[in-house]
Amino acid sequence: MNRSRTEIVAMILDAANGGTTKTKIMYNVMLTYNQLKNYLSILIENNSIEYFEGTKTFKTTEKGLNLLKIHNGMAELLHIIAND
């Protein structure tokens, strides 16, 4: 099953909710190191994820949580429409 970039971003934001390491995100979302590195770079640049140098962890920001909430709402709506 191919995932869209939007789905991958949502999975990363969900995995980083509460704070976690790059390795845990990589395994939870099933991405290669280079793929994850590219996504994290974009998400950090857009203030959707923040990186904590001291603990070497990533955490979804308030903006990222809002994006995730919108994504989940749209996915639910599309699922309802598809089942009508």
Question: Where are the regions a protein language model picked out?
Answer:
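Short alpha-helical segments that sit at the start of domains
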Residues: 1-10
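Short capping segments at the starts of secondary-structure elements
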Residues: 15-21
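A short acidic, leucine-rich amphipathic alpha-helix
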Residues: 24-28
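Short amphipathic alpha-helical interaction segments
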Residues: 30-45
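A short, conserved structural fragment
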Residues: 44-53
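Basic, amphipathic "hinge/linker" alpha-helix immediately C-terminal to the N-terminal HTH DNA-binding motif
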Residues: 56-71
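Amphipathic alpha-helical dimerization/coiled-coil segments
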Residues: 73-84
